[in-house]
Curated annotation (Swiss-Prot):
Protein name: DNA repair protein recA homolog 3, mitochondrial
Residues annotated as binding ATP: 119-126
NCBIfam families noted in UniProt: tigrfam_recA (TIGR02012)
PANTHER family: DNA REPAIR PROTEIN RECA HOMOLOG 3, MITOCHONDRIAL-RELATED, RECA
Transit sequence range: 1-35
Annotated function: Involved in recombination ability and DNA strand transfer activity.
Length: 430
């Protein structure tokens, strides 16, 4: 009898165990189905528009990974390249020079990027930067000028058009202080343009505290490299345009032999890599009225451009104490595109003759409507020319073309350049 009872008890135990196993398997399968349904439902709600049948396991896994990255690091931390902002549509600030804006390819200097303006002394670097500040202030922007050289001329800034009452000025004691306050301003998200004048004047604190004549090997280069790593991250989260003004030095040793660069910029190589645009500005001539020198002819070469084709050059006039002469730019470009007819010393505009360039400049200064009309014609002409160039390029790609290799000349990072200005388009070579 006891034997029979033991057999009955073991049979009941085995039946109970099998029932538990069946329930756990069924529960697990329902749980897995629920997870899959949630993943598909979530991917639908995110706007993918894919049906459950149309999404493979790989696509579901990718969507789950993207959702996890977005929830962990925020919106925009990962995206499809084709859905991002086009480089040609980035917001910009005008440089104050119509010819230079055209040469840059995007209409000005881009927000949220690093731009380097470098060149020899008295070439117009600070003047160009002040024009950018003036244009940004016209759009209601907040601007900061970090005067590391302690040499900003407020009267020149006013003459250019800068609202000095609303311009923030900092004259830091050392390079670390200057770059630290720049980073703080960028992170605030409330500043539109910051100009640092200049990289050569960003003296490291260790050099200031040392003795005269002490060797400080690559101290400034290390400072710039470390600072730019932080600043590039801060800029990626803001819409601040950061302009570094830089000087050039003679390069004494050239390991590349003859034909290598004879000039080099200050602060090491970090700025060259982090800058989205590098503008090399030079004085190429003087402007005289009789015996008096009233200004200089300036050439700006776009050595680096991440947003448009580089190696173009713009030429314009700088009037001493006034800045860029915009009317001269308009006249020169209008002659080039045949909106103004020139015959000797006479200029014909809308059927009226003007004897000499100065007479035409005076007329345009007094009649802003005619000046704006010429600007509108030039803009429409340049847009039409750009569209025609794109069609020509697409047609020429189908045909064999001759490639010409031109060696650069003996200046820092220079290459063949397209001139945008009064003169026709030319190619500069060694």
């Amino acid at each position: 009898m006891a034997r029979i009872l033991r057999n009955v008890y073991s049979l009941r135990s085995s039946l109970f165990s099998s029932e538990l196993l069946r329930r756990s398997v069924v529960g697990t399968s329902f749980q897995l189905r629920g997870f899959a349904a949630k993943a598909k439902k979530k991917s639908k709600s995110d706007g993918n528009g894919s049906s459950e049948e149309g999404m493979s396991k790989k696509e579901i896994a990718l969507q789950q990974a993207l959702d996890q990255i977005t929830s962990s690091f925020g919106k925009g931390s990962i995206m499809y390249l084709g859905r991002a902002v086009s480089p040609r549509n980035v917001p910009v600030f005008s440089t104050g020079s119509f010819a230079l804006d055209v040469a840059l390819g995007v209409g000005g200097l881009p927000k949220g990027r690093v731009v380097e303006i470098y060149g020899p002394e008295a070439s117009g670097k600070t003047t160009l930067a002040l024009h950018v500040i003036a244009e940004a202030q016209k759009q209601g922007g907040t601007c900061v000028f970090v005067d590391a050289e302690h040499a900003l001329d407020s009267s020149l800034a006013k003459a250019i058009g800068v609202n000095t009452e609303n311009l923030l000025l900092s004259q830091p004691d050392c390079g670390e202080q200057a770059l630290s306050l720049v980073d703080t301003l960028i992170r605030s998200g409330s500043v539109d343009v910051i100009v640092v004048d200049s990289v050569a004047a960003l003296v490291p604190k260790g050099e200031l505290e040392g003795e005269m004549g002490d060797a400080h090997m690559a101290m400034q280069a290390r400072l710039m490299s470390q600072a730019l790593r932080k600043l590039s991250h801060s800029l990626s989260l803001s819409q601040t345009l950061l302009i570094f003004i830089n000087q050039v030095r003679s390069k004494l040793s050239t390991f590349g032999g003859f034909g290598g660069p004879t000039e080099v910029t200050c602060g090491g190589n970090a700025l060259k890599f982090y800058a989205s645009m590098r503008l090399n500005i030079k004085r190429i001539g003087l402007i005289k009225k009789g015996e008096e020198t009233t200004g200089s002819q300036v050439s700006v070469k776009i050595v680096k451009n991440k947003l448009a084709p580089p190696f173009r050059t713009a030429q314009f006039e700088l009037e001493f104490g006034k800045g860029i002469c915009k009317i001269t730019e308009i006249i020169d470009l209008s002659i080039k595109h045949k909106f103004i007819a020139k015959n000797g010393t006479f200029y014909n505009l809308n059927g009226k003759n003007y004897h000499g360039k100065e007479a035409l400049k005076r007329f345009l200064k007094q009649n802003e409507s005619d000046q704006e009309e010429l600007m509108k014609k030039l803009q429409d002409k340049l847009i039409a020319d750009e569209a025609a160039d794109k069609e020509t390029e697409s047609e020429s790609e189908e045909e064999d073309s001759l490639r010409v290799v031109v060696s650069p000349d003996n200046t820092d990072d220079e290459s063949p350049a397209l001139v945008v200005g009064a003169a026709a388009v030319v190619v500069e070579a060694a």
